[in-house]
Amino acid sequence: MAWSLMNIGTAFSQNASLGIFEGNGDVGTSLKPGSVHYDSTQKSYTITGGGENMWFTKDAFHFLWKKVSGNVSLAADIQWIGTGGNPHRKACLVIRQNLDPSSAYADAAVHGEGLTSLQYRSSAGDLTHEIQSYIKAPVRARIEKNGNYVSMSLARENEELQPAGGSFRIQLTEPFYIGLGVCSHDSNVVETAVFSHIEIKTIESKKLGEPMLESTLETIAIASTDRKVLYTTRDHIEAPNWSRDGKYLLFNSNGLIYRLEANSKTPQVIDTRLAIHCNNDHGLSPDGKLLAISDQSKDNKSLIYILPIEGREPRLVTSLGPSYWHGWSPDGKTLAYCAERKGQYDIYTIPVEGGEEKQLTNVPGLDDGPDYSPDGQYIYFNSERTGSMQIWRMKTDGSGQEQITKDDCNNWFAHPSPDGKWIVFLSYEKDVKGHPANKDVMLRIMPVGGGEIKVLAKLFGGQGTINVPSWSPDSNNLAFVSYRLINP
């Protein structure tokens, strides 16, 4: 039995010899038709597919599928047949709204060259984006839809599946399609992959205990909004800073500051001596030689200290607390921070050497997150003085305070890019109070001179995602932390 959808060149069939799946066919236009062979003895599927790509706003590939609803996962061993072909050919575990070439979808894609990515199109006709994993050429992959979030796990040879890090938010209407796909990345040829040890599981909603937290350190390219996983852990990590030379990242975890070198998967502790209760407000001096930390070891009140980036006994800067570091002036002479004095949180500055602090804001409600513009003319901050949390800026002496964002989101932690062109910030939904952890949030970006606000990423995060400056030195990328709650 066969039929055609409205999309020209897209045909699908249902066949009783497809094992646990219901149908298969070419999605989009493929000059060479694909096929599926099911080995009922081995319970494996050999899928041949053509198609130009699964990317941009539409896809072309061969798809073996079944309809499902609810929270579900699909896992399989994946093996390419043949060593040649296009390095960008894709063998995929696919979750898809429908069989239209421009459908919303997510897939765990193993490329011919070994690159493995969690790819997605949030809605029909949108551009495709991806989260690249640091795990190359896995032998087994799993894609999981839990609520409105999709994530991926991977396994190398002789290893167990492990989280690949990162997840994204996508809304699919039930029922939707789940299955296996192959794209040759060249419409003139076909490629073949074997999928075996297939598991399709319903994810139970029962909670047997407290969920476990998974933290992922990621970067996002500003131009493409594609994401790359650098590090994933079951520890709680927060607030990345990018080094001035671009060679490493900092983050805090369990009261300590860690340094992760480029291409390394083993963070190293920076020796902060007695400061062992560091929070997520820390960052580097303009020359990259000094580190500012906010530590709560003394009387559980956050105080600001400075130490060499190599580590050493910290030097106290603020004698009053709580004080939370957020910005370093481009000339290296002044620190900006949020502090509570007499029951009110406002923005303050203080010389790097310490001394008398200067109060820059003094209005009812919280003012937080001060960060300097790269030319040293302005301090950007977030304030709830108008009833919701919005982005503001002022001159460095506190004068000329003006509102930058005016929308239905609660916007936090504005960070100007090093080239002075962009402001990135964290946005919560309008009914969220404060900046809690483990919420649906967005990373958003806008031109410094005003203009359209665009979404960089929708993720599960909040507190700890981008509390402090995290731009790459060339302004092309942003570092952040995303989170995932895993039921035991």
Regions picked out by a protein language model, each given a short descriptive name:
Residues 14-207:
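Extracellular glycan-recognition regions
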Residues 204-488:
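Sequence signature of WD/YWTD-type beta-propeller architectures
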Residues 2, 44-46, 53, 370, ...:
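Alpha-helical interaction segments
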Residues 1-14:
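Bacterial Sec-dependent N-terminal signal peptides
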Residues 1, 91, 415-416:
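Short hydrophobic/aromatic-rich motifs at helix boundaries and adjacent loops
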